[in-house]
Amino acid sequence: MSILESVHGPRDLDRLTERELDQLAAEVRAFLVANVAKTGGHLGPNLGVVETTIAIHRVFDSPRDAIVFDTGHQSYVHKLLTGRQDFSRLRQKGGLAGYPQRSESEHDIVESSHASSSLSWADGISRAFEMTGQDDRHVVAVVGDGALTGGMTWEALNNISDDNNRRLIIVVNDNGRSYAPTIGGMARFLNTVRTRRSYRSLYLTSRKAFEKLGGPGQSLYRGIRGGLHGFLSRFSDNEALYSNLDIKYIGPVHGHDIGAMEEALRQAKNYGAPVIVHAITQKGRGYEPALRDIADQFHAVGQIDPETGDPIGSPAKPNWTGVFAEEIVALAEENPKLVGITAAMLRPTGLHRFAERFPDRVYDVGIAEQHAVTSAAGLAFGGLHPVVAIYATFMNRAFDQVLMDVALHKAGVTFVLDRAGVTGPDGPSHHGIWDLAILQVVPGIRLAAPRDATRFREELAEAVAVADAPTVLRFPKGSVPADIEAVRRRDDGVDVLHESDQKDVLLVTVGPMAGLGLRVAEALAAQGIGATVVDPRWVVPVPRSVLDLAAGHRIVVTMEDGIRVGGIGTRVRQDLREAGIDTAVDELGLPDEFIDHATRDEILDDAGLTPQKIARDLVAQVLGSRVPIARPLPVEEFTEPSPERKKRRA
């Protein structure tokens, strides 16, 4: 039995010798590479926190002591050490989540995955412990250096520093990267600490001196290394950043030296007040393919060959992010006023190609979505047209800025929302299912959802031409479907994708739901029911021709991959009522609940968004066995199908 297999909980670590702990770290890395290679997941971040996580669980008593991970994608090691070693279905339906999840374990305190929130959680939890007389309980917040670029971190530190009676330890996992190399003034400061000659050279010189003494020297070094780190950190004056906050600072500490980390954490634990432990780590540690990956050191991978790190399976199809990456560069070639903004996600959003071509016209603001949006408003005021590329789920963080800084000021800013709708394996915090409901209430906003690459190019060009209002383009994660050509385009830009002589059902599809709408129409036709399928292209505001078409049909069905409540269907229903059109409306979308990790197809199936389920329900409505929403059919129609309908069904 391996050492890892003998670890069923954190207290099993207590009996391990130093040599066994080092062996455990090696086994954990081998386990992660072998298993994440099969399922995909966040590999690089977890390889970088193995020793640090082991040390945390040896020094603190989870779950009595609360351990909170910022951007919890680096919690795989934590899962392994708390009895969850079945990674065979990691990030798959019914398997382990890719982030902390309370339903999995009492050791998962916060279901974190959005950056920069852990210190606020830690502030609140530690205050609660203090106020309820649980003074012997500690809170440990593990935060990456990338998250230090987020404003919430500093808001929390401001409050934490105001109360020095709490047992709160902040472990800064400093690997110089978030997705890619961390940027900004904070990153430069930490890099100075990480590489400062006064610390690094003295530490290495001292270590080598002990190692020259052979076995006895190495034993002596292991015994005093924690003190050595503390002495050298004070000598090299690395506390400057936190001195005015009145928070104790320990470090920098070698984050891959379990003994040194334990010593630093025990010092922090015994201090009895908020302490920052600054751990220097290496993303992708111990896995050569990750270390060779300069772009993001295997931050997140699909299925790979564990020996080489090369992707396996069929060649990747063109994806939405790639289409955006190409098209924004093409538009920028023609329009020198186009600039790009991203929040620490240059490559994941596709703006890296823009940066390569126009390095002076792209801005990475760090993990600071609110700042990104208001900065974009300022750029627009100065005569530029900013394109803010961001994941849909992270757009939620900057709603006030979109509303008050962009829309109120009629600023021409384009938001490109990647990973909109169901994203699949990353779970509830990463599904981009709220953007339609949230953003459609913003006055003056225009919102597009392209169904394919050709429509994306059209709509992006249209969006960046708008100079007096915010525009939004949203698209899902994954490969781009084949182009779906319109039968005809109406004067206001609405594409008719399919039409029938019988005007029974109008299917209004949002973006990538167009293909589903066409399959539903085909299934309805087999039952003698006529359907028209339209893609509004720009779904907010609702184009007038959608209302006109609705007036000529018996039922309108809206289909979107966002939440039903407050979504585009709600907007269509409201506009129809205001226009005096009483056509029944059936709004199809996702439930207003947090959806667990699974594939996109599995989630859509669970929500009833399949051709068979939708068609079956519509047949019941049209042929009379179920009353459609909003406008009941005449009694004679839903109690007994007309002879004409009986004939068509036959």
Curated annotation (Swiss-Prot):
Function: Catalyzes the acyloin condensation reaction between C atoms 2 and 3 of pyruvate and glyceraldehyde 3-phosphate to yield 1-deoxy-D-xylulose-5-phosphate (DXP).
UniProt-recorded Gene Ontology molecular function terms: 1-deoxy-D-xylulose-5-phosphate synthase activity; magnesium ion binding; thiamine pyrophosphate binding
Disulfide bonds: none
The UniProt record lists the keyword Transferase: yes
Pathways involved: Metabolic intermediate biosynthesis; 1-deoxy-D-xylulose 5-phosphate biosynthesis; 1-deoxy-D-xylulose 5-phosphate from D-glyceraldehyde 3-phosphate and pyruvate: step 1/1
Species, as recorded: Leifsonia xyli subsp. xyli (strain CTCB07)
Alphabetical keyword list: Isoprene biosynthesis, Magnesium, Metal-binding, Thiamine biosynthesis, Thiamine pyrophosphate, Transferase
UniProt name for this protein: 1-deoxy-D-xylulose-5-phosphate synthase
Cofactor: Mg(2+); thiamine diphosphate
Lineage start: Bacteria, Bacillati, Actinomycetota, Actinomycetes, Micrococcales
